[in-house]
Amino acid sequence: MLHGVERVRTRWLLVVQAALAAGLAYWFALDVLGHPNPFFAPMAAFIGLNVMVEGPRLKFSFQLVLGAALGVGVGDVIFSVLGPGIWQLTLGVLVAMIIGVFIGRGPLVVNQAASSAVLIATIMPPGTDLSYERMLDALVGGLIGVLVMALLPRNPIPESRRVVATVLDMGADVLYDVARGLENRDAERIAAALQVARSTQRDVTQMDSIIADGVEQVQVSPLMWHRRRHLRSLARVVHPVDNAVRNVRVLARRAIIAMQDSAVPSPEVIDLVKGCGQSMRTVRRLLDDAPSLAEIPEWGELPHDDTKTGAFRVVEDDGPVTAEVAIRDLRILAAHMRPALVDGATLSEMVIFAQCRSLVVDMLQVCGLSRKSAVAALPPTTDRPGVPPEVWDLNEDD
Protein backbone atom coordinates (compact mmCIF):
# COMPACT_ATOMS: atom_id res chain seq x y z
CA MET A 1 0.00 0.00 0.00
CA LEU A 2 2.69 2.48 1.05
CA HIS A 3 4.85 1.62 -1.93
CA GLY A 4 1.87 2.18 -4.23
CA VAL A 5 1.34 5.61 -2.70
CA GLU A 6 5.05 6.33 -3.15
CA ARG A 7 4.89 5.36 -6.82
CA VAL A 8 1.93 7.69 -7.35
CA ARG A 9 3.73 10.48 -5.50
CA THR A 10 6.81 10.21 -7.70
CA ARG A 11 4.86 9.82 -10.95
CA TRP A 12 1.90 12.16 -10.55
CA LEU A 13 3.34 14.91 -12.73
CA LEU A 14 4.12 12.40 -15.48
CA VAL A 15 0.47 11.31 -15.37
CA VAL A 16 -0.64 14.94 -15.63
CA GLN A 17 1.75 15.48 -18.55
CA ALA A 18 0.39 12.46 -20.44
CA ALA A 19 -3.27 13.36 -19.83
CA LEU A 20 -2.74 17.00 -20.80
CA ALA A 21 -0.78 16.02 -23.92
CA ALA A 22 -3.56 13.65 -25.00
CA GLY A 23 -6.21 16.34 -24.60
CA LEU A 24 -4.18 19.00 -26.40
CA ALA A 25 -3.29 16.64 -29.25
CA TYR A 26 -6.93 15.66 -29.75
CA TRP A 27 -8.04 19.32 -29.69
CA PHE A 28 -5.34 20.40 -32.14
CA ALA A 29 -6.05 17.62 -34.64
CA LEU A 30 -9.83 17.99 -34.33
CA ASP A 31 -10.33 21.77 -34.23
CA VAL A 32 -7.16 23.21 -35.75
CA LEU A 33 -6.41 20.63 -38.44
CA GLY A 34 -10.06 19.73 -38.95
CA HIS A 35 -9.59 15.97 -38.87
CA PRO A 36 -12.96 14.30 -38.11
CA ASN A 37 -11.66 11.37 -36.06
CA PRO A 38 -8.09 12.07 -34.85
CA PHE A 39 -7.68 8.82 -32.94
CA PHE A 40 -3.90 8.58 -33.35
CA ALA A 41 -3.16 12.08 -32.06
CA PRO A 42 -3.99 11.47 -28.37
CA MET A 43 -2.75 7.89 -28.62
CA ALA A 44 0.70 8.97 -29.80
CA ALA A 45 0.78 11.76 -27.22
CA PHE A 46 0.22 9.71 -24.07
CA ILE A 47 1.98 6.56 -25.28
CA GLY A 48 5.06 8.63 -26.11
CA LEU A 49 5.01 10.01 -22.55
CA ASN A 50 4.79 6.56 -20.97
CA VAL A 51 4.55 7.34 -17.28
CA MET A 52 6.17 4.07 -16.20
CA VAL A 53 9.27 4.36 -18.37
CA GLU A 54 12.50 4.81 -16.41
CA GLY A 55 15.02 6.37 -18.70
CA PRO A 56 15.24 8.94 -21.49
CA ARG A 57 11.67 9.41 -22.73
CA LEU A 58 12.49 11.62 -25.72
CA LYS A 59 14.09 8.73 -27.59
CA PHE A 60 11.26 6.46 -26.49
CA SER A 61 8.66 8.95 -27.73
CA PHE A 62 10.45 9.36 -31.06
CA GLN A 63 10.55 5.61 -31.62
CA LEU A 64 6.88 5.16 -30.77
CA VAL A 65 5.72 8.01 -32.99
CA LEU A 66 7.90 6.81 -35.86
CA GLY A 67 6.56 3.29 -35.48
CA ALA A 68 2.95 4.47 -35.28
CA ALA A 69 3.29 6.67 -38.36
CA LEU A 70 5.00 3.85 -40.24
CA GLY A 71 2.34 1.30 -39.31
CA VAL A 72 -0.52 3.65 -40.16
CA GLY A 73 0.99 4.53 -43.53
CA VAL A 74 1.77 0.95 -44.52
CA GLY A 75 -1.59 -0.29 -43.29
CA ASP A 76 -3.54 2.37 -45.15
CA VAL A 77 -1.72 1.73 -48.42
CA ILE A 78 -1.96 -2.07 -48.32
CA PHE A 79 -5.54 -2.32 -47.08
CA SER A 80 -6.76 0.39 -49.44
CA VAL A 81 -5.37 -1.52 -52.43
CA LEU A 82 -5.98 -5.13 -51.36
CA GLY A 83 -8.94 -4.69 -49.04
CA PRO A 84 -9.44 -6.17 -45.55
CA GLY A 85 -8.83 -9.82 -44.75
CA ILE A 86 -6.63 -12.28 -42.91
CA TRP A 87 -3.84 -12.57 -45.46
CA GLN A 88 -3.94 -8.80 -46.05
CA LEU A 89 -3.43 -8.22 -42.30
CA THR A 90 -0.55 -10.70 -42.31
CA LEU A 91 1.04 -8.94 -45.26
CA GLY A 92 0.55 -5.51 -43.67
CA VAL A 93 2.23 -6.56 -40.42
CA LEU A 94 5.05 -8.24 -42.37
CA VAL A 95 5.77 -5.17 -44.50
CA ALA A 96 5.53 -2.76 -41.54
CA MET A 97 7.96 -4.84 -39.46
CA ILE A 98 10.41 -5.29 -42.34
CA ILE A 99 10.52 -1.53 -42.90
CA GLY A 100 10.91 -0.98 -39.14
CA VAL A 101 13.82 -3.42 -38.98
CA PHE A 102 15.38 -1.78 -42.05
CA ILE A 103 15.19 1.67 -40.43
CA GLY A 104 16.93 0.19 -37.39
CA ARG A 105 15.75 2.63 -34.73
CA GLY A 106 15.10 0.03 -32.07
CA PRO A 107 12.52 -2.61 -31.13
CA LEU A 108 9.88 -0.04 -30.20
CA VAL A 109 9.67 1.15 -33.82
CA VAL A 110 9.14 -2.39 -35.08
CA ASN A 111 6.56 -3.33 -32.46
CA GLN A 112 4.62 -0.09 -32.75
CA ALA A 113 4.60 -0.31 -36.55
CA ALA A 114 3.13 -3.81 -36.37
CA SER A 115 0.49 -2.90 -33.76
CA SER A 116 -0.55 0.21 -35.71
CA ALA A 117 -0.91 -1.84 -38.88
CA VAL A 118 -3.13 -4.31 -37.00
CA LEU A 119 -5.20 -1.43 -35.66
CA ILE A 120 -5.73 -0.06 -39.16
CA ALA A 121 -6.74 -3.49 -40.46
CA THR A 122 -9.22 -4.33 -37.70
CA ILE A 123 -10.64 -1.29 -35.93
CA MET A 124 -10.06 1.64 -38.28
CA PRO A 125 -10.07 0.23 -41.83
CA PRO A 126 -9.16 2.43 -44.80
CA GLY A 127 -11.93 4.71 -45.97
CA THR A 128 -12.84 6.06 -42.53
CA ASP A 129 -10.22 8.85 -42.82
CA LEU A 130 -7.68 10.08 -45.30
CA SER A 131 -4.44 8.12 -45.04
CA TYR A 132 -2.18 11.14 -44.69
CA GLU A 133 -4.41 12.53 -41.92
CA ARG A 134 -3.81 9.53 -39.67
CA MET A 135 -0.07 9.70 -40.21
CA LEU A 136 -0.18 13.42 -39.48
CA ASP A 137 -2.21 12.79 -36.32
CA ALA A 138 0.46 10.41 -35.02
CA LEU A 139 3.21 12.94 -35.69
CA VAL A 140 1.21 15.78 -34.13
CA GLY A 141 0.53 13.71 -31.01
CA GLY A 142 4.20 12.91 -30.56
CA LEU A 143 5.29 16.51 -31.02
CA ILE A 144 2.70 17.82 -28.57
CA GLY A 145 3.85 15.23 -26.04
CA VAL A 146 7.42 16.52 -26.29
CA LEU A 147 6.16 20.12 -26.06
CA VAL A 148 4.23 19.36 -22.87
CA MET A 149 7.29 17.65 -21.41
CA ALA A 150 9.33 20.78 -22.16
CA LEU A 151 6.81 23.36 -20.91
CA LEU A 152 5.54 21.42 -17.89
CA PRO A 153 8.71 19.76 -16.62
CA ARG A 154 9.15 17.98 -13.34
CA ASN A 155 12.19 18.68 -11.21
CA PRO A 156 14.45 15.65 -11.80
CA ILE A 157 16.94 16.52 -9.05
CA PRO A 158 15.15 15.04 -5.97
CA GLU A 159 14.34 11.70 -7.61
CA SER A 160 17.84 11.43 -9.08
CA ARG A 161 19.45 12.11 -5.70
CA ARG A 162 17.07 9.74 -3.96
CA VAL A 163 17.74 6.81 -6.28
CA VAL A 164 21.52 7.19 -5.85
CA ALA A 165 21.03 7.40 -2.09
CA THR A 166 18.94 4.22 -2.12
CA VAL A 167 21.72 2.28 -3.84
CA LEU A 168 24.27 3.58 -1.33
CA ASP A 169 21.94 2.65 1.54
CA MET A 170 21.73 -0.92 0.32
CA GLY A 171 25.50 -1.12 -0.02
CA ALA A 172 25.98 0.22 3.51
CA ASP A 173 23.51 -2.31 4.91
CA VAL A 174 25.32 -5.17 3.17
CA LEU A 175 28.70 -4.07 4.54
CA TYR A 176 27.29 -3.75 8.04
CA ASP A 177 25.83 -7.26 7.95
CA VAL A 178 29.05 -8.69 6.50
CA ALA A 179 31.10 -7.06 9.27
CA ARG A 180 28.75 -8.32 11.99
CA GLY A 181 28.72 -11.76 10.41
CA LEU A 182 32.51 -11.90 10.43
CA GLU A 183 32.66 -10.74 14.04
CA ASN A 184 30.12 -13.30 15.22
CA ARG A 185 31.18 -16.10 12.83
CA ASP A 186 27.65 -15.96 11.42
CA ALA A 187 27.86 -17.43 7.92
CA GLU A 188 24.09 -17.27 7.41
CA ARG A 189 24.06 -13.53 7.96
CA ILE A 190 26.85 -13.01 5.46
CA ALA A 191 25.08 -15.26 2.96
CA ALA A 192 21.89 -13.21 3.35
CA ALA A 193 23.89 -10.02 2.83
CA LEU A 194 25.44 -11.50 -0.31
CA GLN A 195 21.98 -12.28 -1.68
CA VAL A 196 20.97 -8.68 -1.09
CA ALA A 197 24.14 -7.45 -2.79
CA ARG A 198 23.39 -9.62 -5.81
CA SER A 199 19.86 -8.23 -6.03
CA THR A 200 21.02 -4.62 -6.28
CA GLN A 201 21.64 -4.68 -10.04
CA ARG A 202 18.03 -3.72 -10.72
CA ASP A 203 18.45 -0.67 -8.49
CA VAL A 204 21.72 0.26 -10.19
CA THR A 205 20.04 0.02 -13.60
CA GLN A 206 17.14 2.11 -12.31
CA MET A 207 19.59 4.71 -11.01
CA ASP A 208 21.28 4.94 -14.39
CA SER A 209 17.93 5.25 -16.21
CA ILE A 210 16.43 7.87 -13.90
CA ILE A 211 19.50 10.10 -14.05
CA ALA A 212 19.63 9.74 -17.84
CA ASP A 213 15.96 10.79 -17.89
CA GLY A 214 16.79 13.81 -15.74
CA VAL A 215 19.67 14.83 -18.00
CA GLU A 216 17.33 14.65 -20.98
CA GLN A 217 14.69 16.77 -19.24
CA VAL A 218 17.07 19.59 -18.44
CA GLN A 219 18.26 19.57 -22.05
CA VAL A 220 14.73 19.67 -23.53
CA SER A 221 13.03 22.12 -21.17
CA PRO A 222 14.20 25.76 -21.11
CA LEU A 223 12.66 25.99 -17.64
CA MET A 224 15.20 23.45 -16.40
CA TRP A 225 18.33 24.76 -18.08
CA HIS A 226 19.51 26.32 -14.84
CA ARG A 227 19.70 22.80 -13.34
CA ARG A 228 21.97 21.32 -15.99
CA ARG A 229 25.04 21.72 -13.81
CA HIS A 230 23.41 19.79 -10.95
CA LEU A 231 22.36 16.94 -13.24
CA ARG A 232 25.83 16.75 -14.77
CA SER A 233 27.25 16.38 -11.26
CA LEU A 234 24.81 13.59 -10.46
CA ALA A 235 25.53 11.88 -13.77
CA ARG A 236 29.22 11.81 -12.87
CA VAL A 237 28.57 9.78 -9.70
CA VAL A 238 26.75 6.95 -11.50
CA HIS A 239 29.96 5.18 -12.54
CA PRO A 240 31.69 5.26 -9.11
CA VAL A 241 28.46 4.20 -7.37
CA ASP A 242 28.15 1.30 -9.80
CA ASN A 243 31.77 0.37 -9.08
CA ALA A 244 31.12 0.59 -5.34
CA VAL A 245 28.20 -1.83 -5.58
CA ARG A 246 30.35 -4.28 -7.55
CA ASN A 247 33.10 -4.00 -4.94
CA VAL A 248 30.57 -4.68 -2.18
CA ARG A 249 29.50 -7.86 -3.96
CA VAL A 250 33.10 -9.06 -4.33
CA LEU A 251 33.77 -8.30 -0.66
CA ALA A 252 30.67 -10.21 0.46
CA ARG A 253 31.58 -13.22 -1.69
CA ARG A 254 35.09 -13.27 -0.29
CA ALA A 255 33.72 -13.02 3.26
CA ILE A 256 31.71 -16.20 2.61
CA ILE A 257 34.88 -17.95 1.39
CA ALA A 258 36.75 -16.73 4.47
CA MET A 259 34.10 -18.30 6.70
CA GLN A 260 34.21 -21.56 4.75
CA ASP A 261 38.01 -21.67 5.06
CA SER A 262 37.94 -20.74 8.77
CA ALA A 263 40.08 -17.73 7.86
CA VAL A 264 38.21 -14.92 9.57
CA PRO A 265 39.94 -11.55 9.06
CA SER A 266 41.56 -9.70 11.91
CA PRO A 267 39.49 -7.26 14.01
CA GLU A 268 41.33 -4.38 12.33
CA VAL A 269 40.21 -5.46 8.86
CA ILE A 270 36.65 -6.04 10.10
CA ASP A 271 36.73 -2.49 11.48
CA LEU A 272 37.66 -1.29 8.01
CA VAL A 273 34.59 -3.05 6.59
CA LYS A 274 32.39 -1.37 9.20
CA GLY A 275 34.05 1.95 8.48
CA CYS A 276 33.36 1.60 4.76
CA GLY A 277 29.72 0.85 5.48
CA GLN A 278 29.31 3.83 7.77
CA SER A 279 31.14 6.12 5.35
CA MET A 280 28.89 4.92 2.53
CA ARG A 281 25.90 5.86 4.67
CA THR A 282 27.43 9.27 5.34
CA VAL A 283 27.81 9.87 1.60
CA ARG A 284 24.21 8.75 1.19
CA ARG A 285 23.12 11.44 3.66
CA LEU A 286 25.19 13.95 1.74
CA LEU A 287 23.15 13.19 -1.37
CA ASP A 288 19.71 12.81 0.15
CA ASP A 289 18.93 13.18 3.84
CA ALA A 290 15.18 12.74 3.37
CA PRO A 291 13.52 9.62 4.82
CA SER A 292 12.45 6.94 2.37
CA LEU A 293 10.37 3.77 2.45
CA ALA A 294 13.57 1.74 2.19
CA GLU A 295 15.05 3.41 5.28
CA ILE A 296 14.61 0.24 7.36
CA PRO A 297 15.92 -2.85 5.55
CA GLU A 298 14.24 -6.20 5.81
CA TRP A 299 17.54 -7.94 6.49
CA GLY A 300 19.96 -7.73 9.40
CA GLU A 301 19.93 -5.17 12.17
CA LEU A 302 19.77 -1.43 11.92
CA PRO A 303 23.32 -0.09 11.47
CA HIS A 304 23.45 2.16 14.52
CA ASP A 305 26.51 0.54 16.10
CA ASP A 306 29.03 2.43 14.01
CA THR A 307 32.79 2.88 14.25
CA LYS A 308 32.97 6.37 15.67
CA THR A 309 34.56 5.03 18.87
CA GLY A 310 37.15 2.97 16.98
CA ALA A 311 40.48 3.84 15.46
CA PHE A 312 38.93 6.29 13.05
CA ARG A 313 36.00 8.63 13.37
CA VAL A 314 33.02 9.07 11.14
CA VAL A 315 30.44 11.83 11.18
CA GLU A 316 28.02 11.75 14.10
CA ASP A 317 24.58 10.39 13.20
CA ASP A 318 22.84 13.66 14.07
CA GLY A 319 25.52 16.05 12.84
CA PRO A 320 25.49 18.06 9.64
CA VAL A 321 26.82 16.35 6.55
CA THR A 322 28.82 18.37 4.04
CA ALA A 323 31.14 17.30 1.26
CA GLU A 324 34.09 18.55 3.31
CA VAL A 325 33.08 16.42 6.31
CA ALA A 326 32.51 13.32 4.19
CA ILE A 327 35.83 13.72 2.34
CA ARG A 328 37.71 14.28 5.59
CA ASP A 329 36.29 11.16 7.20
CA LEU A 330 36.95 9.09 4.09
CA ARG A 331 40.55 10.29 3.98
CA ILE A 332 40.99 9.40 7.65
CA LEU A 333 39.55 5.96 6.95
CA ALA A 334 41.86 5.60 3.94
CA ALA A 335 44.90 6.48 6.04
CA HIS A 336 44.26 3.40 8.20
CA MET A 337 44.42 1.11 5.17
CA ARG A 338 48.15 0.48 5.38
CA PRO A 339 49.47 -2.61 3.57
CA ALA A 340 51.24 -3.64 6.78
CA LEU A 341 47.79 -4.35 8.21
CA VAL A 342 47.57 -7.55 6.16
CA ASP A 343 51.18 -8.73 6.39
CA GLY A 344 51.04 -12.51 6.62
CA ALA A 345 47.27 -12.53 6.12
CA THR A 346 45.27 -15.12 4.22
CA LEU A 347 44.18 -14.52 0.63
CA SER A 348 40.59 -13.86 1.71
CA GLU A 349 41.68 -11.23 4.21
CA MET A 350 43.85 -9.54 1.58
CA VAL A 351 40.95 -9.46 -0.89
CA ILE A 352 38.58 -7.97 1.69
CA PHE A 353 41.23 -5.39 2.56
CA ALA A 354 41.74 -4.54 -1.13
CA GLN A 355 37.99 -4.15 -1.67
CA CYS A 356 37.82 -1.74 1.27
CA ARG A 357 40.50 0.37 -0.38
CA SER A 358 38.58 0.35 -3.65
CA LEU A 359 35.37 1.35 -1.87
CA VAL A 360 37.07 4.38 -0.34
CA VAL A 361 38.23 5.46 -3.79
CA ASP A 362 34.70 5.06 -5.14
CA MET A 363 33.14 7.09 -2.32
CA LEU A 364 35.70 9.87 -2.65
CA GLN A 365 34.81 10.10 -6.33
CA VAL A 366 31.11 10.33 -5.43
CA CYS A 367 32.04 13.24 -3.16
CA GLY A 368 33.57 15.04 -6.14
CA LEU A 369 37.25 14.06 -6.17
CA SER A 370 38.93 12.89 -9.34
CA ARG A 371 40.05 9.29 -9.43
CA LYS A 372 43.70 10.34 -9.17
CA SER A 373 43.02 12.45 -6.07
CA ALA A 374 40.97 9.63 -4.54
CA VAL A 375 43.72 7.06 -5.10
CA ALA A 376 46.27 9.47 -3.63
CA ALA A 377 44.41 9.33 -0.30
CA LEU A 378 45.45 5.68 0.18
CA PRO A 379 48.78 4.60 1.64
CA PRO A 380 50.93 3.26 -1.23
CA THR A 381 51.35 -0.47 -1.72
CA THR A 382 54.64 -0.22 -3.67
CA ASP A 383 57.83 1.79 -3.49
CA ARG A 384 56.96 3.50 -6.78
CA PRO A 385 53.19 4.15 -6.78
CA GLY A 386 51.55 5.31 -9.99
CA VAL A 387 49.92 8.20 -8.11
CA PRO A 388 51.98 10.21 -5.58
CA PRO A 389 50.34 9.61 -2.19
CA GLU A 390 48.68 12.40 -0.22
CA VAL A 391 47.75 10.43 2.88
CA TRP A 392 46.01 12.05 5.83
CA ASP A 393 48.30 12.60 8.82
CA LEU A 394 46.72 10.54 11.59
CA ASN A 395 48.70 12.49 14.18
CA GLU A 396 46.68 15.63 13.41
CA ASP A 397 44.02 16.69 15.86
CA ASP A 398 40.75 15.84 14.12
At which residue positions do the language-model features occur?
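Non-transmembrane accessory domains of multi-pass membrane transporters/channels
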Residues: 134, 151-219, 234
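Interfacial segments of multi-pass membrane proteins
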Residues: 48-52, 119-126
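A cytosolic-side transmembrane-helix exit/cap motif
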Residues: 59-66, 107-117, 131-138, 182-185
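Soluble C-terminal extramembrane regulatory/interaction domains of multi-pass membrane proteins
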Residues: 233-398
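Transmembrane alpha-helices and immediately adjacent membrane-cytoplasm interface residues
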Residues: 104, 126, 130, 134, ...
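Alpha-helical transmembrane segments of integral membrane proteins
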Residues: 89-101, 110-124, 143
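Membrane-water interface at loop-to-transmembrane-helix junctions
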Residues: 225-234
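Alpha-helical transmembrane segments and their membrane-interface boundaries
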Residues: 1-94, 98, 106-107, 343-347, ...
